[in-house]
Amino acid sequence: GTAGSLDELVHWAQIQLARSRQALRLADVLRALGDGEAIDGHLDFVSKLDYEVELAVVLGRDALHVREEDVGDYIFGYSVANDVSARDVQYRHKQNFLGKSLDTFFAMGPVIVTADEFPCPPALSIRSFVNGELRQNSVTDQVFFNIRHIVSELSQGMTLPAGTILITGTPAGVGMGMDPPCFLKRGDVVTCEIDGIGRISNPIR
C-alpha cells in the first residue's frame, strides 16, 4: 500500500540518490557468504559499513530480449540477500561498484525457494535486524525495483545467463538513513529475513 511505497522513497531520499530512471549496477561477487559466516568489514579503510536486506532473484534460463509479461518463466527461485555496502567508499568514488563489491560483501541464503511457491512478483514480509534490533520492515513487492522490469530491461541486447542473481532494492531503515547515522562495527550481527524463505545472520569481523 501507500505506506510501504513511501518507505521506499524515504530510503532513497535519505541517501540522496535522485534519479529519473532506475540505476542498474553489476557487482563483482566471487562468492556469497552463507548463514553464520563472517563479513569482513575491511574496517581498516571502511568507516561507514552498512547493511541492505534484499530479495534475491535467481534465473533458471538464459534470458535475452525478455518481455515483462514473460519474466516469470525465467525465474528459478528466490532467496534472502544482504547487500553489504561501504558508504564512504561509494561516495569517495561517486559510484556503487567498489563500495558494494569488496570481498565478503554479499551474503545469501539459507535456501533458494523455487519460483512456483510464489506469485511473480512475490509479496513477502522482509526485515533486517542489527544485534536483535529491528531496522528494516517492509514487503517485497513494495521495493524500489520491479522484478519484471529489471529482468526485461537488463536482457535487452545482453544475455543474462542461467544462475544470474539479481537483487531488487532495500526498504527504509539502513544505517545511513538513521538520525544520527548508525553504521556497523566489529562484533555486530546482522540478520536478514524474508517470510516464506528464511533468515541469515552474519557477524562483522
Model-identified regions with their sequence ranges:
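Catalytic-pocket segment enriched in acidic/His residues
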Residues: 87-205
